Amino acid sequence: MRIRFSKMHGLGNDFVVIDGISQTVRLTPEKIRKLADRHFGVGCDQVLLVEIPEQPNVDFRYRIFNCDGSEVENCGNGARCFAVFVRERRLTGKRVIRVETAGGIIELRVQDDEQVSVDMGVPRLLPEKIPFVADQQAVTYPLDVAGQVCSISAVSMGNPHAVMLVDDVKSAPVGQLGPLVENHPRFPARVNAGFLQVVSRDEINLRVYERGAGETLACGTGACAAVVTGRLRGLLNDTVKVNLPGGSLRISWPGEGHSVIMTGPAVTVFHGQIKL
């Protein structure tokens, strides 16, 4: 089976994007791992699949697969690439695109400067909705990680995030703590681990160890979760510049009960075909 695809990235968080509407695509975990392999495949952090939606009043179904073959609920950087892809492939001419994900419906807006704003939905803070094992909802929770107690905030942006404050992201133990937090038993669906440094009320630095992918150059949902965390802790204003290793995003969140809006770039690197 030969599959047409586009290689894209959002701030270095890179994707293989596949049109599953105009061609027949049957992905298995093994095929996804082959696609994502940087030595024997195309190479990417995640594989994104465009499908016909199952719900009414929605334009597309948006599916996300990690490089280990697991399917996840949402990906913010991927959502921006998704919006650019469906327009480039002429699957739609709309600038406002509604898509269904495993984490819910999100709205994508392609701006005149080709930056893409994504309505990431209302963050979920109830532990059972994340999911996270806790007796009651709180802004911060103590988490025992290999005998060390870390203070984290737990947020779902359609996928689960644990965010901890650090003095300096450059020296943060992302590679050591990241996989331990990701697989912590209090997160039954595993979790993305964010390491947040507050620069000012309008700016933060962030590194994210992604569930099933490891540390990436950028994580859109992680940026949203970090701003939500900072806002709940009283550290940030409602619009924040988030600096990630691959570049910067703008995240806006008025507060509880409101959607998080993420704005940033999406770039097509090349188009290709691969036999799977």
From Swiss-Prot:
Its EC number is 5.1.1.7. Its main location: cytoplasm. It is found in: Cytoplasm. One of its GO terms (cellular component) is cytosol. The keyword Nucleus does not apply. Catalyzes the stereoinversion of LL-2,6-diaminopimelate (L,L-DAP) to meso-diaminopimelate (meso-DAP), a precursor of L-lysine and an essential component of the bacterial peptidoglycan. The gene is dapF. The active site is at 75 (proton donor), 219 (proton acceptor). GO terms for molecular function: diaminopimelate epimerase activity. It is an enzyme of class 5 (isomerase). It catalyses: (2S,6S)-2,6-diaminopimelate = meso-2,6-diaminopimelate. GO terms for biological process: lysine biosynthetic process via diaminopimelate. Keywords: Amino-acid biosynthesis, Cytoplasm, Isomerase, Lysine biosynthesis. Pathway: Amino-acid biosynthesis; L-lysine biosynthesis via DAP pathway; DL-2,6-diaminopimelate from LL-2,6-diaminopimelate: step 1/1. The record marks 161, 210 as: Could be important to modulate the pK values of the two catalytic cysteine residues. It comes from Cellvibrio japonicus (strain Ueda107) (Pseudomonas fluorescens subsp. cellulosa). This is Diaminopimelate epimerase. Substrate binds at residues 13, 46, 66, 76-77, 159, 192, 210-211, 220-221. The record marks 270 as: Important for dimerization.
